[in-house]
């Protein structure tokens, strides 16, 4: 359901907490866009933040942990069971952050993202059961901060993946991807989502242009995502439409 993710747009919003913010929060900001250089660093960050959130943690620690669990599930998990645990732990951490700071758009984003990925990994029926929760979080994030670029990737992929009878809409998916790209043209996950949508609507030449732009991008917002997710997916999609017009 997702093609996402993060980059500079994912600034961890400071929220009032009883404890001091862990220095690991700042490190997450760096590693989240360079994890391809040393994926094992995600293990250490996960473990360190798990220790930091014991007791009465700072909301920023919980948000950082939710983010790391999501990336870890995508990149480090070796089995479906490990992925499910990672996304579940991520949404639990984000839920705790929301309890402390209900207007923290970043906390809500990671709650929605982990929830959506958990449902997707669990299977179609579970994913659809969680759909209202994800949709409500998207609406809330857009109300809180319409400049939160990553939420447009999440929203676009939800509109793209969900059946039309349940709210899926390729036109709205395209609109969400374009809105995100207007804010950050180098957010390659958005461009991959746009390319997929254009393929599904039969606009092959336009899709090919967008997907080639992903491969040609020399300064992606998130280099790690571009390296391990967006570029490989763009190549696969381009191969899939080879010879089509």
Protein language model regions, located:
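TPR alpha-solenoid repeat register
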Residues: 59-61, 107, 151, 190, ...
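Conserved structural position within tetratricopeptide repeats
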Residues: 50-54, 92-99, 139-143, 175-182, ...
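Structural signature of tandem alpha-helical TPR/SEL1-like repeats
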Residues: 39-43, 78-92, 125-137, 166-179, ...
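Terminal, low-structured helical/coil segments at or just beyond the last alpha-helical repeat
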Residues: 200, 206-245
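Short coil turns that delineate tetratricopeptide repeat
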Residues: 56-57, 102, 146, 185
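N-terminal leader/linker segments that initiate helical-solenoid repeat arrays
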Residues: 18-77
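"A position-specific structural signal for the A-helix of alpha-solenoid helical repeats
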Residues: 26-31, 64, 71, 110, ...
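Short coil/turn linking the two alpha-helices of tandem helical-hairpin repeats
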Residues: 31-39, 66, 71-80, 117-126, ...
């Amino acid at each position: 359901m997702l093609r996402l993710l993060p980059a500079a747009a994912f600034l961890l919003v400071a929220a009032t907490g009883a404890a001091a913010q862990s220095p690991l929060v700042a490190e997450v900001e760096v590693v989240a866009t360079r994890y391809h250089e040393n994926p094992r660093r995600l293990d250490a960050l996960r473990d360190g933040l798990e220790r930091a959130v014991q007791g009465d943690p700072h909301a920023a620690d919980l948000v950082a942990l939710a983010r790391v669990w999501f990336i870890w599930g995508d990149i480090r998990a070796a089995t479906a069971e490990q992925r499910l645990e990672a996304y579940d732990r991520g949404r639990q951490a984000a839920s705790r952050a929301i309890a402390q700071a209900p207007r923290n758009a970043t906390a809500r984003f990671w709650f929605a993202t982990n929830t959506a990925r958990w449902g997707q990994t669990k299977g179609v029926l579970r994913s659809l059961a969680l759909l209202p929760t994800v949709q409500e979080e998207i609406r809330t994030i857009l109300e809180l901060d319409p400049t939160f670029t990553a939420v447009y990737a999440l929203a676009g992929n939800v509109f793209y993946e969900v059946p039309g009878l349940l709210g899926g809409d390729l036109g709205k998916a395209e609109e969400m991807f374009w809105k995100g790209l207007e804010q950050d043209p180098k957010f390659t996950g958005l461009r991959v989502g746009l390319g997929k949508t254009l393929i599904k609507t039969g606009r092959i030449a336009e899709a090919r242009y967008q997907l080639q732009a992903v491969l040609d991008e020399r300064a992606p917002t998130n280099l790690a995502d571009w390296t391990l997710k967006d570029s490989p997916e763009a190549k696969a999609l381009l191969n899939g439409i080879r010879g089509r017009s």
